[in-house]
């Protein structure tokens, strides 16, 4: 604001406007140019180039260019992941980058080691090795898996099979995080011929089942200090768990794939009960971030459920969710965040985690909690149904990722995807209230590795055949 006639006062540091990626960039560019003219009396001679541009400029409707860009995006994503390894993979991988950018344009690196991020990133490396023939990535994945199935995995006693959340929350178990850490081991067993982790994965599923309610749903997490035999029995005897795709859908996907890998019918039965219960309540499930997230999270497990049972009612569940999801598709290719009634746990919060929409209709896609799951989900849906519509949805979701991947000479950004993308502005921009994972956050696991695996899965499935 102006103080007198010749002083402009700013309540925050402006000098890092470019490095800190102030957005919307068009508005900030106009404002910075105005300041320069006000100070100097003339139009500025130049404006600094953005440190990030989003996506390829190629025509992705052309099949050859699509395949070239997909291959390039996978390679860039794999290189980005390598930059966050701990001790060359022997210590796992860092979580990624937080939303926060300080006054000098420095990013906050989330350097804790999470089991889910480590397992997911190992999965991306292993798929890349399988398809490219670059064996060093398979060796790298093997080192990372020693973290997942080593110190993060309890063996023996009443907690046998419990998988730890992360290095600074040693006794916490989120079944969603466990599932995402272990699903790559199931992809490996079922589609790449390596069954070395199936026995341990079954132990982890057995532990989760021992703390799952009668309806096939688990509470959002368990803490080891609470889990006496009496408490575990109480959890099993509860009629209902938490009907949330955020917390339970990928647990069910892991159960179903573990059932196929091991032949244990119980896994399929528990997953079927849980998914059928959620679909009884759908779309009024217990939302964490948004209604869009719940739909995106359900595609993979419902596809695997139909693949496992062949039942028409399960096919109809898959199509119902996939068709509902199209109602929030944006012309740019992503899916708008939507939350009917704003009932999600983190809807429009300002003190902790927060969804990225301010109101329904915002043209914002969430690549941490929603759109990131779709390449893998649609790949499995096509595999389960043979319906070309799902193949086109897979391709559409990949094209969206190709148009939102970051290109930059800053190595901590180049090749990654950030959490939120405004599909009108065509840049990262959204409600900034989340304390750690707002628009600019980049997760090694949840986002980058999941997108990469989803991009590669059709090739894995084709190679198996």
Describe the role of every protein-language-model region.
Residues 27-34, 50-54, 66-84, 133-151, ...:
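Extended, well-ordered alpha-helical scaffold segments
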Residues 37, 41-117, 135-168, 200-228, ...:
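Low-complexity, Ser/Thr/Pro/Gly-enriched N-terminal "stalk/linker" regions
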Residues 101-118, 163-180, 188, 230-248, ...:
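Solvent-exposed loop and edge beta-strand segments that line ligand/cofactor-binding
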Residues 154-157, 337-342, 391-465:
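CBM-like carbohydrate-recognition segments
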Residues 53-68, 119-135, 180-196, 249-264, ...:
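Well-ordered alpha-helical scaffold segments within catalytic/enzyme domains
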Residues 190, 195, 206-261, 265, ...:
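Active-site lining segments of carbohydrate-active enzymes
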Residues 1-50:
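A glycine-centered loop/beta-turn motif at secondary-structure junctions
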Residues 88-106, 266-280, 313-366, 431-444, ...:
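Extended glycan-interaction surfaces of carbohydrate-active proteins
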């Amino acid at each position: 604001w102006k103080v007198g006639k010749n002083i402009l006062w700013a309540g925050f540091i402006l000098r890092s406007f470019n490095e800190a990626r102030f957005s919307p960039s068009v508005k900030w560019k106009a404002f910075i140019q105005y300041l320069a003219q006000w100070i100097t009396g003339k139009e500025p001679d130049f404006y600094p180039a953005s440190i990030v541009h989003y996506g390829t400029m190629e025509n992705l409707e052309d099949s050859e260019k699509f395949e070239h860009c997909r291959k390039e995006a996978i390679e860039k994503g794999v290189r980005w992941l390598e930059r966050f390894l701990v001790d060359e993979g022997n210590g796992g991988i860092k979580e990624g980058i937080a939303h926060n950018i300080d006054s000098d344009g420095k990013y906050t690196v989330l350097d804790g080691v999470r089991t889910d991020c480590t397992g997911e990133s190992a999965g991306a490396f292993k798929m890349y090795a399988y398809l490219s023939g670059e064996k060093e990535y398979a060796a790298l994945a093997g080192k990372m898996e020693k973290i997942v199935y080593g110190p993060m995995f309890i063996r023996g006693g009443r907690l046998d099979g419990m998988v730890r959340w992360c290095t600074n929350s040693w006794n916490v178990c989120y079944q969603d995080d466990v599932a995402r850490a272990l699903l790559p081991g199931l992809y490996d067993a079922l589609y790449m011929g390596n069954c070395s982790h199936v026995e341990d994965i079954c132990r982890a599923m057995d532990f989760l089942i021992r703390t799952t309610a009668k309806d096939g749903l688990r509470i959002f997490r368990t803490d080891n200090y609470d889990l006496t035999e009496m408490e575990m029995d109480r959890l099993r005897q509860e009629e209902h768990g938490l009907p949330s795709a955020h917390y339970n859908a990928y647990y069910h996907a892991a159960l179903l794939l573990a059932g196929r890998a091991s032949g244990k019918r119980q896994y399929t039965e528990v997953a079927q009960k849980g998914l059928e219960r959620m679909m009884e309540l759908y779309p009024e499930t217990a939302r964490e971030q948004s209604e869009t997230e719940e739909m995106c999270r359900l595609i993979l497990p419902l596809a695997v459920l139909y693949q496992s049972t062949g039942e028409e009612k399960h096919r109809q569940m898959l199509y119902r969710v996939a068709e509902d999801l199209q109602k929030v598709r944006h012309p740019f290719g992503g899916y708008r965040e939507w939350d009917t009634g704003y009932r999600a746990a983190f809807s429009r919060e300002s003190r902790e985690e927060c969804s990225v929409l301010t109101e329904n209709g915002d043209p914002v896609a969430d690549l941490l909690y929603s759109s990131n799951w779709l390449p893998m989900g649609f790949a499995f849906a096509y595999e389960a149904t043979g319906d070309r519509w799902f193949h086109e949805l897979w391709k559409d979701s990949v094209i969206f990722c190709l148009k939102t991947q970051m290109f930059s000479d800053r190595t901590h950004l180049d090749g990654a995807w950030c959490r939120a993308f405004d599909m009108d502005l065509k840049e990262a921009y959204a409600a900034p209230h989340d304390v750690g994972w707002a628009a600019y956050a980049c997760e090694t696991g949840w986002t980058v590795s999941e997108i990469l695996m989803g991009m590669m899965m059709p090739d894995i499935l084709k190679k198996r055949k």
